[in-house]
Regions:
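A conserved helix-loop-strand patch within extracytoplasmic ligand-binding domains
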Residues: 1-32
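Short amphipathic alpha-helical coupling segments at ligand-binding clamshell hinges
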Residues: 14, 117-129
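C-terminal functional modules
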Residues: 133-169
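Soluble non-cytosolic domains of exported or imported proteins
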Residues: 6-9, 29-34, 56-59, 116-117, ...
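Ligand-binding pocket segment of bilobal, Venus flytrap-like solute-binding proteins
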Residues: 30-98
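A bilobed periplasmic-binding-protein/Venus flytrap-type ligand-binding module shared by bacterial periplasmic
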Residues: 1-9, 105-118
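Extracytoplasmic/secreted envelope proteins and their assembly/folding machinery
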Residues: 12, 16, 36, 40, ...
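Metal- and O2-centered redox machinery and metal/ROS homeostasis
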Residues: 8, 15-18, 41-52, 73, ...
Length: 169
């Protein structure tokens, strides 16, 4: 679960204590999404009697977050990394000492098993490429703001020539 940095709650358990600050609701995304199921589990596991999960959509959730940020109103949303909202605002995950949401996840590069034989340069490049969730989020924010994906990639490359050079060695 994600909150703006100005929100007082630090842990999921704190949500009960601060429920009135955000009208006792967690703004979610589409019902049935994995993060929504985990949030329902967290509400039960942390005994959050004053909290309701409100399904919506990804765009509706980020619209609610935008409004809350503009007025500095507390809000709790479901979320994940990478996502452009982390490049837009100072957000943080609430601590989850019961580990309801599990360990941090990662993104892997997957390629056809024959790629190394057919295109060794491409395979070598894919093995070297690495970028942080923050970097991905920044590119996602450009795209969300209307920059074409290829132009967003060009902008990132222009700002990070040393990184790209390492990948191309």
């Amino acid at each position: 679960l994600i909150v703006p940095d100005y929100v007082e709650a630090k842990t999921i358990a704190d949500l009960e204590k601060y429920a009135k600050d955000f009208d006792g609701k967690i703004t979610g995304i589409d019902a049935g999404a994995g993060v929504m199921r985990r949030t329902e589990e967290a509400i039960k596991e942390y005994d959050l009697k004053s909290i309701k999960l409100m399904p919506s959509s990804g765009p509706a959730m980020t619209t609610a977050l935008t409004r809350a940020e503009k007025s500095q109103k507390p809000i709790v949303v479901t979320g994940w990394i990478p996502h452009w909202m982390f490049a837009q605002w100072k957000l943080r995950f609430l601590e989850d000492p019961k580990n309801v949401f599990g360990e941090a996840e990662h993104v892997d590069t997957v390629a056809n098993p024959g790629l190394e034989a057919k295109a060794p340069e491409a395979a070598a490049f894919l093995k070297k490429i690495s970028w942080s969730a923050e970097e991905v989020g920044a590119v996602m924010l450009l795209i969300r703001d209307g920059v074409k994906p290829d132009e967003a990639a060009k902008q990132w490359i222009a700002k990070n020539p040393d990184r790209v050079a390492e990948w191309l060695k």
